[in-house]
Amino acid sequence: IDNVCIRGHVGQMSLKAHGIDLSREHVKLNDAMLSDADIIVELSDTVPPDTTPSENFWKINLDRLKLRNSALAVHMPGDTLSVKTIFTNALATQAYFDLYKGLYTVRHIDWDGGGLRYDQNYEPAVRGFDYNHLLLAALSIKADSFYYCNSRIDLKVRQAMFREKSGLVVDSLRGRFMMDSLKLALPDLKFSTPGSQVRMKMAMDLNAFDDIRPGILETEVHGAIGRQDLMLFIGNALPRALARTWPRYPLVVNGKMRGNLQKMHLSGLTLKLPKTFSMTADGFVANLTSPERLRSDLNLYATAHSLKFILPLLPRDVTNVIRIPDGIAFKGRVHVYGSRYGSRFVATQGGGTVRG
């Protein structure tokens, strides 16, 4: 195989075939088993390709494939990306491979115990949940179908659970995963952790975060995110004092977003932290990565039930003379253009009203 180096060892491998048709280039495998194997696949872009004409028309039907205590690692060219999977006990049934078309399908997957490691090797590691360096343990996946052809993946996950090195524990994950060379789609994803329950839909162009002519990210989210999970994802972006005093209630999130970092539209986006605050926003935010060029036009309704958790952010001489009352409400339209802010609003607290 051009540009591929495969090495490692296999403890035990067995195949049972009751139908090999050489004339039709077709193999019927009843059972296959791989045990105590450690295989490394290294892809290289420096090896000249084999230009000898050859075509592989073989097709393989596989009834059952068992993997036990085995590992498979893949290293991309230049070792920019590496992925390692560990199978404690896995079973795949009703598989079909067409080597000429590059078509691979599996009817059922039952992966019970193992792990997965994903590393963007030239990206620095960060605290919390690190998208570039994932390490999943106690991994269990039950899938009803898997399809791969022409860089298109379609996977239907019936049930999955795992632990991530950051501390994230996923008790249940269900949904469909679709991806090709241009787009990623999660049409109906549901997942829960000990402190969170979320249902979401997402469709994203893979160039959605490009600087020039970016694609579109579209997502709809409904659920509640527990404090521990929230801090894994945004804790590093918050001031330490605020992260310490953040209330221990789940953050309720509902709404839709569509756009990219150049311009993001919000539709019915609602954030609610019980006994603390609630906020609903519609409109857009633009130039998200350039604070000096930030623009927004938002219809905003917010109620602050209690803002005591932000007091550590204020200087002591301020908190000694100023008290932030409970029950502040704000309704208005907010404009931001760089360092300039403007709003037409009504703010109320108790029996008082301020208009601007």
Outline where the language-model segments fall.
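N-terminal targeting/secretion presequences
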Residues: 1-356
